[in-house]
Amino acid sequence: MKAAELRNKTQEELGDELISLLKEQFNLRMRKATGQLNQVHLLRKVRRDIARVKTVLNQKAGE
């Protein structure tokens, strides 16, 4: 997900996206802990997507 795509969304949509990503991160961490996660790169991808969403939310809050 690109930051440019996120900037076109409203704050409510970004909040929903953030909640969705946090749930996905939790599920991936649980799968990793139980040894069921083969694609460990997804953890890094989701973590960075969360950071992008939070950054855009903070930018919108400052406007």
Curated annotation (Swiss-Prot):
Gene: rpmC
Protein name as annotated: Large ribosomal subunit protein uL29
Keyword Ribonucleoprotein: yes
Gene Ontology CC: one annotated term: cytosolic large ribosomal subunit
GO biological process, one term: translation
Lineage: Bacteria, Pseudomonadati, Pseudomonadota, Gammaproteobacteria, Oceanospirillales
InterPro entries registered for this protein in UniProt: Ribosomal_protein_uL29 (IPR050063), Ribosomal_uL29 (IPR001854), Ribosomal_uL29_sf (IPR036049)
Matches recorded under Gene3D superfamilies: 1.10.287.310
GO molecular function terms listed in the Swiss-Prot or TrEMBL record: structural constituent of ribosome
Similarity-based family: Belongs to the universal ribosomal protein uL29 family.
